[in-house]
Amino acid sequence: MSKGSYLHEYLTNLPDFIFDYIEIYYTGESINTQIGYCIDLRIFLEYLQKFRFKSVEKLEDFTCEHMGEVKAQDIIRFKAYLKEYESTYISPDGKKVTRTRRNSSFGINRKLSSVRGLFSYLYKTDQISENVTDKIDMNKLHQQIKKPLSTQETMRLLDILYNGERFFTGRYLTEYMRTKQRDIAIFISYLGTGVRVSELVNLNIQDICFDTSSFIVTRKGGDEQEIFMPVQVENELFKYIEERKSLDGIKDNNALFISRQGKRMTVSSVEKMIKKYCTAAGIIDPDKSRPHALRRTFACRLLEDGVDIKMVAELMGHKNIEVTHKFYAQYNSAAKRDVMRNIDVTGDIK
């Protein structure tokens, strides 16, 4: 089932006012983002159906009138419920399965944010008389430092990418040789441009322009941005595109990066590929073996090289510079180290 069909199925089983909300506010967002909101709101409706409106038989039977009856206390209880709850679904083989679900503070906040967005929409469009979610505080999040790849880790990764013949054997070597140039092009594009994994897999052949040494990506929200390529990125993409011309069984002629099945690579397939190489390089930190680690490494390298944070924000596709400052400026350890090393602790004291 395609993602578009998956989204349609979700919306079909939700009330009309949620369909309208997603259609109006999130049409420009990626399908994955829209599906995420649908899942969050479905969990909220399932909670209301179980504890607040037991007479509602199907989720699609909920109305704006029901939302107008929701109290702040209901949202507070839903917030507590999200810490640990049971969900029941029908498996592909027709069996009824019950699972215990748990959410971190981040997961709880994300779901509350989805509910807040819905109630804000209903209030602004005069479909409810009060937005009770304004009274609810989000969980306080403690920021955790997720480090970029070190220079040594980056070099080990690149060594395996370019010289995998020394590291892989048997069928793993066969697989490596078959996708070597594609994988190199993906890694170097990440490290050299900092694009998001979704932006990378959505690239088409026609998005690449070697005359201008750039390519076009569709950022979050649907805006297009021209990304200029470092020489290494341009060279590896050119080699891959030349090799791609000789590949057999391509089913998606537009897609830049092709899977072994001849289809456009998915976010999941790129994640698995990156994890495979990180494992081979001895990188066991799960936060460093995800695509975002390469994006983080790109941003941190720019900051350590003294690139202005406004330029870094633009290159990262951040509309708000505060996002760049919050999530990446903290990693500029070189500058912090220099400041601390030059502090005269004792002054003139002998």
Regions found by a protein language model. Give the residues of each.
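Conserved catalytic core of the tyrosine transesterase superfamily
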Residues: 1-350
